[in-house]
Amino acid sequence: MIEQIKSSEIKKFIEKNPNTVLLHVRKEDEWNTVGKPISDSLGIKNFFITISQDSGFIESVKKEINKENQILVMCAAGGRSIIAANLLQNEGYNTYNVSDGFSGNGQDLGWKNYGLPTN
């Protein structure tokens, strides 16, 4: 089962888990129109790898991210990221779903609206 993390909890999570990375799985056109998170100022690396059918998602992640990392997986509102987090957990990765995503999920603010750094 994937642990759910709200954007409001991310800074505290990173403090406790310095080996954390942020994996953003939205499509590139979404990054360009809505914005994208910048996690460098929080002391963690950003990875932008889109999840879609037959996209080679797992292989792309394997090339970029170590299995020793804690991976915060994010999309717009938490739906695609939970799918990605489950796929990666099945491959042996330590994944956590950012449940309110980048833009919020109707209950919680999301990365952007919580005031975390964006581009």
Question: Would you name each region that the model predicts?
Answer:
Residues 1-20, 28-70, 81-119:
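Rhodanese-like catalytic fold shared by cysteine-dependent sulfurtransferases
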Residues 73-74:
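Short, surface-exposed ligand- or partner-binding patches at beta-edge/loop junctions that are enriched
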Residues 24:
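Conserved active-site aspartate in kinases
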